[in-house]
């Protein structure tokens, strides 16, 4: 049988099993001596809060943002379609909390931008929408395919 030992002078304030030291931000860029940095610029993010960052429509109600991995938010969007479309474009540069479910090309790709904006407005309040768009190179047509299980 094991003996119980009391240690009155020992205080365990943060056991190793519970305490995890906070990691500092990673270094942005370390170049070996044989590389020469050609550009090193830091720029604040866009501060426009009254227009959707994807479709440029006026935001007349509470905007939606992209959630980052560390719990922050970036961007202002009129719908989940716009939010997810931009998130799918920037996911290699911004650590996202969740994978985007919709991926549309930027509006500059489309000849009839109003058709795309009408689709965004039609599905703005729908939940469970997912899908993508497909570029047909031979006919220069973009097919938008958005679906829902609900």
Curated annotation (Swiss-Prot):
A UniProt-annotated Pfam family: zf-FCS
InterPro entries: Poxvirus_VLTF2, Znf_MYM
Gene Ontology molecular-function annotations: zinc ion binding
Source organism superkingdom: Viruses
Protein role: Acts with RNA polymerase to initiate transcription from late gene promoters.
Protein family according to the UniProt entry: Belongs to the chordopoxvirinae VLTF-2 family.
Subunit description: Interacts with itself. Interacts with the late transcription factors VLTF-1.
Name of protein: Viral late gene transcription factor 2
UniProt organism field: Vaccinia virus (strain Ankara)
């Amino acid at each position: 049988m094991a003996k119980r030992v009391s240690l009155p002078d020992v205080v365990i304030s943060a056991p190793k099993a519970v305490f995890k030291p906070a990691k500092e931000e990673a270094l942005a860029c370390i170049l070996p001596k044989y590389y020469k940095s050609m550009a090193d610029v830091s720029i604040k993010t866009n501060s426009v809060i009254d227009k959707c960052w994807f479709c440029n429509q006026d935001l007349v109600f509470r905007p939606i943002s992209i959630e980052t991995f560390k719990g922050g938010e970036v961007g202002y969007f009129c719908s989940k379609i716009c939010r997810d479309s931009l998130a799918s474009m920037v996911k290699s540069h911004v650590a996202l909390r969740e994978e985007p479910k919709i991926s549309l090309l930027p509006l500059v790709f489309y000849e009839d931008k109003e058709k795309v904006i009408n689709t965004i407005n039609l599905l703005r309040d729908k939940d469970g929408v997912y899908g993508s768009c497909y570029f047909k190179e031979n006919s220069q047509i973009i097919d938008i395919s958005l679906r829902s299980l609900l």
